[in-house]
Amino acid sequence: MNLEKVRNIGISAHIDSGKTTLSERILFYSGRIHKIEDVRGGGDGATMDHMELEKERGITITSAATSVTHNGYHINLIDTPGHVDFTVEVERSLRVLDGAVLVLCSVGGVQSQSITVDRQMKRYQIPRLAFINKMDRTGANPRRVVEQLREKLGADAFLAQIPIGAEENFRGVVDLIEMVAYTFEGDQGEKVVTGEIPADLKDEAEEARVAMLDSLSNYSDEVMELLLSEEEVSKDMIYRVMREAVLNGATPVYMGSAYKNKGVQPLLNAVTQYLPSPLDREIYGRDPSDEEKKIELSPDPDKPFVGMAFKIVEDPFGQLTFMRIYQGTIKKGEAYTNQRSQKKERFSRIVRMHSEKRDEIDEAGPGDIIAVMGIDCASGDTYCSERDYATLESMYVPEPVIKIAVNPLNRGDGDKMSKALQRFRKEDPTFSVYTDEETNEILISGMGELHLEIYIERIRREYGVEIEVGAPKVSYRESPTREVEFNYKHKKQTGGSGQYAHIVGKLIPIESESEDSFEFEEKVVGGRIPKQYIPAVEKGFRDILGKGPIADYPVVGTRIELLDGSYHDVDSSEKAFYTAAQGCFREYFKQAAPKLLEPIMSVEIEVPEEFQGTVTGDVIRRRGLMTSNDTNEGMTVILAEVPLAETFGYATDLRSMTQGQGTFTMELAAYRQTPSNIQEEIIAERKKDELAGAR
């Protein structure tokens, strides 16, 4: 395969921007499917949405992967979910892509999930194009969307096309490089007709072209000089500089209406012209024997194989592992080593995926995205042809914010349910399962109500198990707010040798809410505590952080400075110092004025203007803090920060407040102190649960 002609791209966006519809048209125009299906309503549902639930709800839950050919280019296309509860799917697919298309709605513009996706693209330094979809909608305003790209995302965005006609009269686009008009004919827009720019758009097109060249001049001294001397910039130069600009962070903007079959083919051309091939990306692995040491990987088919498992799906035929190959070649029947588990596994079946259909292949080389059947691994694992060759850094996985108790209605279904939960846990790192020690309930936790609802629904459908679901529970945290000095002795005299440990130091609050935000610093001088006991002190403190003294929630934002202490030649041991650290924490943490922290969600609500007052009042009643509201073309977008505890059941409430016309998304913004009256309620509730559990 000629690597220059390979593109690994993702299609990312806010929910309901028409992303899956766009993917569907790309499959159709590249000849991969012969009939267009719509996302909602009758028919078979979109090709990329292959899970029953996705077809019903009209949202994309898991990233489907498929490959298409366009103008001699091989494009691996990943359709990612737009709903914030499925963010990890987006993280996973971006990690293995070389480029992306950010889809925006011509009316909604840059919405909360577009901002999240943008942040993820920046994290993985992914060059991208923007596509303004739904140009046929009332209120379509592409220039406003470009402004928002600049202001809200800080993107260097500029128009590469302008629209011909507006709203229901949208007919096509003007290409600002070729300076021609493209309109779309045939039953399904498959015929692209090139014509002259309509007379009434000539001036606007000239202006937009000047603005585009002006933006490109920031990436090329040559273009800058030609513009300054008022000379013509050749088309070849514009194409070349446009590609350099995209690889260096520029975002050219294309437009169309995927649903009305307009504007998709020019976008596909731009994908092949400007987005990077695997040869354009620098990829580094890490040396397993030295984490600090980077290893440059090259897309060379003859070098040792390095690939990353970025998605795992269990299907009736066993585990299906999606993999991106960064270096070397994999061959059917050969064995490769999982760098984490050090297990060697035979790749007996390699397939190229088209949504859930699969084509068997014998080998695959660098830059390709394929799936391997029947290997046992976890998402994020690196495979190589040799042991300890390289690991690819793992993906960023956000911490879960909501948990609920689940029980099978029929006792005999316990095994089936636990099999399903273990499978989902393997597929999705943001989904976890554990047993509550006090109540013995099975708890599942995830990124939001919809996230967990979908899994419960999948257990019902795929495993035939009816589930009883408890009320959602919030993952609170406990945190100190005042510095305290401690001086703690642990003495125990039993028959034979006793236990003795003495520690002195400070417990200091620090700004952080992640579960691993514990700092430990040892400043003991003169061997007052022998070096071999220090790790036991740190471990004692670290191990007790899982359950804080206020209400048994994890403790965060804590720093321990160990300053002094004493020991006994006979009675001191690692165990004694470990126990001392735990006893010290129990006694002194209460003196540090500990507070409960609660997850605060950043919520974006979109409602028809006439419901604005009702919805705003409801947000305030939920202890919400309004950050902005913006009304445009009869729709109001409200941004607010609301405690997670107050959002349960919000989807239903919003539907009834807005006659089914309101939509919302939310994601974790931060952990903040809980008001004292709420804190007292939570503690009382915990005590009640404990008493109930003890009975």
Curated annotation (Swiss-Prot):
The gene is fusA. CDD domains: EF-G, EFG_III, EFG_mtEFG1_IV, EFG_mtEFG_C, mtEFG1_II_like. It comes from Rhodopirellula baltica (strain DSM 10527 / NCIMB 13988 / SH1). The keyword Nucleotide-binding applies. Catalyzes the GTP-dependent ribosomal translocation step during translation elongation. During this step, the ribosome changes from the pre-translocational (PRE) to the post-translocational (POST) state as the newly formed A-site-bound peptidyl-tRNA and P-site-bound deacylated tRNA move to the P and E sites, respectively. Catalyzes the coordinated movement of the two tRNA molecules, the mRNA and conformational changes in the ribosome. Pfam families: EF-G_D2, EFG_C, EFG_III, EFG_IV, GTP_EFTU. Keywords: Cytoplasm, Elongation factor, GTP-binding, Nucleotide-binding, Protein biosynthesis. This is Elongation factor G. Residues 4-279 form the tr-type G domain. InterPro entries: EF-G-like_DII (IPR053905), EFG_II (IPR041095), EFG_III (IPR009022), EFG_III/V (IPR035647), EFG_IV (IPR047872), EFG_V (IPR035649), EFG_V-like (IPR000640), P-loop_NTPase (IPR027417). Belongs to the TRAFAC class translation factor GTPase superfamily. Classic translation factor GTPase family. EF-G/EF-2 subfamily.
